[in-house]
Amino acid sequence: MSDTRVTIVGGGLAGSEAAWQLAERGHDVTVHEMRPVVKTAAHHTESLAELVCSNTFKSTDTSNAHGLLKAEMRALGSLILWAADEARVPGGAALAVDRIVFASAVQSRLEAHPRISIERGEITTIPSPSVIATGPLTSDALATALRARLGVDALSFYDAIAPVIAYDSIDHDVVFKASRYGKGETEAEREEGAYLNCPMSREQYESFIDALLAGDKYQGHAFDEAPYFEGCLPVEEMAARGRETLRFGPLKPVGLRDPRTGRDAYAVVQLRQEDRAGRMWNLVGFQTRLRIGDQERVFRSIPGLANAEFLRHGSIHRNSYVNSPASLTPALTLRDDGQVFLAGQITGVEGYTESSATGLLAGINLSRVLNGGEPVIPPATTMLGALYRYLREADPAHFQPMNANFGLLDELPKPERDKRRKRERFAARALADIESWQREHSLDAALPGAVTT
């Protein structure tokens, strides 16, 4: 057992989970949380694991992607989910919590652990061994240190996320595959096309613009206000600049002849492949601040997307995150130091559960490394493993944060048409595989019910 003290930078969900996993595996840990010495615009307390936005961890149903990820985390002994259960309030199938009770439960467990100490104050350099889990509001000084280490373009400070649609929910009798002017990096792309294209008539385009302009926009928090860059304006902001703006921007039809009519459409919405398997496609240029209900209503009015299944919704907000596929190892360590792990939203995951999950695996893997072993990643048939695969294999040129969704998972060996049954089969396979993986690598669950000394 290594006697090296581990530094956790950031006492949020991911940092707290990582600290617990390491301490339960016999490592001495110091959690550094900069609050209250350095305040943020989002936090209201000094507590570790403060929930600054919603008070829900989303669904617990394993036929839901978020519920499946929770089930996998429970198998591994998640502190965060233990605390959420302790603080649970009525919320139907959602794991809703009392924020104060939740944060208190996490902090009290960490404070009571004989191997964990908590220090308040800002960390401005990158320690080793460590887990960097500073979240979307990473301090300027540490962000500068990360950029110096990873490269000037490796760290983003705002995300502009376009919705992602499930391939099998797209109407391929309406949508056609093509690249603009027949261009492509490979012969297959030039022959078949790299994009899915939704052609619009003038009437359809005008109706779409009306719906887009009438959509209800998320106002956000003061800390969440993102400066709009000309290269990634919200789609509704572009529409507000003039009714033809989108038609001469991301919806320009030139070079995309509709094979059914032999003519260019009045406007074309393009979808670009998001994953290697081709099951997830994002709406190109459709970063948006529309509320979720209006995103679904407005974007389903696009020809070919009437039954679109949204695997990820669009957003624009303050979010410090690393271009993980370009900058980190598959285990989310620095490439020049395998004892510095990143976890939480800074890796490019979205959501409370996803952030906590990466903290859990970072803690497990740093423990393995300190004991002379290698990091291990669950198979991509599990939600945790599939998230890590996305962070490893996503296109670095178009990398955007991702939440848990079934489109990330390996396809089932035998197709399933019924959506509910398909998700149940995904879940059954994932839970069996996480158990096998856990057994293969002798990963005992770090159960929060008892402190290990």
Describe these PLM feature segments:
Residues R5, D28, A154:
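Residues at the starts of beta-strands that form the adenosine-phosphate
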Residues R88, P401-T453:
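C-terminal auxiliary extensions adjacent to catalytic cores
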Residues L283-V349, S356-T358, V376-E393, P401-N403, ...:
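A glycine-rich dinucleotide-binding beta-alpha-beta segment and adjacent secondary-structure elements
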